[in-house]
Amino acid sequence: MMINTQEDKLVSAHDAEEFHRFFVGHDSDLQQEVTTLLTREADLLDIQAYKAWLEHCVAPEIKYQVISRELRSTSERRYQLNDAVNIYNENYQQLKVRVEHQMDPQNWYNSPKIRFTRFVTNVTAAKDKSAPEMLHVRSNLILHRARRGNQVDVFYATREDKWKRIEGGGIKLVERFVDYPERSPQTHNLMIFL
């Protein structure tokens, strides 16, 4: 099944290519394996086991990027600005600094403790044709963050990941590209891992 972007003008070439990759390369066993993997990752992040997440899920060569795209219509644009801005553009060391900041007892952000609930949906997975140890994974994420009785935030995002099979049978995240749909976040902060 192919998407004709000339006829379906609202579909970007990138989205059409990704849809084709997952539609053609569908593998039920791989789908189940990746769904289980993402569920375990979400559980680690929900219970705030950030060091375990870094150790067991994240590869040292990670590229972790969260962007926000321009959501205004073309007629509303006055200037030729970039369509996307980085919210986060991090490597392993930068993620490690964020994790250590979360562990700091002086960090007011964790008092009272925050509760997270992640819903990972619409998971699709495909093996890379040129590098069979590499997996392409696309998913949607809903993240609920609650702190105190009246401070609740909900985040929605689409994630495009690359996971790599490593020696010893594990799988680690080497690239995460998160498309966060709010240009100006309506939350208190984005001190979260998506």
From Swiss-Prot:
GO terms for biological process: 3-phenylpropionate catabolic process. Component of the 2,4-dinitrotoluene dioxygenase (DNTDO) multicomponent enzyme system which catalyzes the incorporation of both atoms of molecular oxygen into 2,4-dinitrotoluene (DNT) to form 4-methyl-5-nitrocatechol (MNC) and nitrite. The beta subunit seems to have a structural role in the holoenzyme. Also able to convert naphthalene to cis-(1R,2S)-dihydroxy-1,2-dihydronaphthalene. Disulfide bonds: none annotated. The 2,4-dinitrotoluene dioxygenase (DNTDO) multicomponent enzyme system is composed of an electron transfer component and a dioxygenase component (iron sulfur protein (ISP)). The electron transfer component is composed of a ferredoxin reductase (DntAa) and a ferredoxin (DntAb), and the dioxygenase component is formed of a large alpha subunit (DntAc) and a small beta subunit (DntAd). It comes from Burkholderia sp. (strain RASC). It comes from the Bacteria. GO terms for molecular function: dioxygenase activity. This is 2,4-dinitrotoluene dioxygenase system, small oxygenase component. The lineage of its organism: Bacteria, Pseudomonadati, Pseudomonadota, Betaproteobacteria, Burkholderiales. It holds the Pfam family Ring_hydroxyl_B. Keywords: Aromatic hydrocarbons catabolism, Dioxygenase, Oxidoreductase.
